[in-house]
Design a protein with these regions (language model features):
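N-terminal signal-anchor module of multipass membrane proteins
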Residues: 1-60, 66-69
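Alpha-helical transmembrane segments and their helix-start/interface "positive-inside/aromatic belt" motifs
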Residues: 12-15, 116-127, 186-191
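Membrane-embedded alpha-helical segments in integral membrane proteins
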Residues: 13-16, 67-79, 136-144
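Transmembrane alpha-helical segments that form the membrane-embedded catalytic/substrate-channel core
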Residues: 27-30, 99-103, 163-173
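Juxtamembrane membrane-water interface segments of multi-pass membrane proteins
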Residues: 33-56, 73-81, 105-116, 171-189
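Select subsegments of transmembrane alpha-helices in polytopic membrane proteins
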Residues: 56-64, 123-131, 190-191
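Membrane-interface helix-loop-helix junctions at boundaries between adjacent transmembrane segments
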Residues: 82-91, 100-162
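Loop-centered beta-sheet repeat module
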Residues: 146-191
Length: 191
């Protein structure tokens, strides 16, 4: 194996960049997905604080996902076609969840007090849908896109675990960014 040959090291570089992009997405968008799933708990004032803590960052975090998928498409177009064909439904549902989150976040900011409850629920549903679908896709990918009941069950289990992991990251974010009763509630949600 000649490491000076571009055909040897270039795929390794692209896989490393894709891995970095997906890791950054999971960490950076994971905390705001987690905060979104924690949004149903708390009073209206606490919900404002929770949304305010992610407000400046949440939209830019999804850029890492776009970068990772873009690298997959440009570096490995055949793999991109196979993976997205196998994961068409969960990818579509994840995109629906991400779009719902964006709409809910923007409309919530302009909504009257009576309507904020609806947009909070929409933000929660979008966050839960996106995180669960990401976990399901990860589980399906790990097993090689199985069509068996056991493979589907594994994907569902990983979906639940990824959602729980994002809630953990979101609670840690709230512990760092808030104080008082909301911070104590975030600490309790860890245990």
């Amino acid at each position: 194996m000649n490491f000076l040959d571009v055909q040897v090291w270039l795929p390794i570089v692209f896989v490393g960049l894709m891995g970095l992009a997906m890791m950054m997405y999971a960490i950076l968008d994971g905390y705001d997905l987690g905060v979104g799933m924690l949004l149903l708990s708390g009073d209206p004032e606490q919900k404002e604080i929770m949304i305010g803590s992610i407000g400046p960052f949440w939209d830019a975090n999804e850029t890492w996902l776009v970068l990772g998928v873009g690298l997959l498409l440009t570096a490995f177009p055949v793999a991109h076609g196979i993976i997205l064909t196998e994961l068409y439904l969960p990818v579509t549902l994840m995109l629906f969840g991400l779009i719902l989150r964006g709409v809910a976040f923007d409309f919530r900011a302009k909504a009257k007090v009576a309507q904020k409850k609806f947009w909070n629920k929409a933000f929660f549903i979008g966050s839960l849908t996106a995180s669960f679908c990401q976990g399901y896709m990860l589980g399906s990918y790990i097993l090689g896109f199985p069509t068996s009941l056991a493979g589907t069950a594994f994907g569902l289990l990983v979906g639940c675990c990824v959602s729980a992991g994002y809630i953990l990251i979101g609670a840690c974010w709230l512990i760092m960014k808030t104080e008082g009763l909301l911070q104590k509630k975030a600490i309790k949600s860890l245990f």
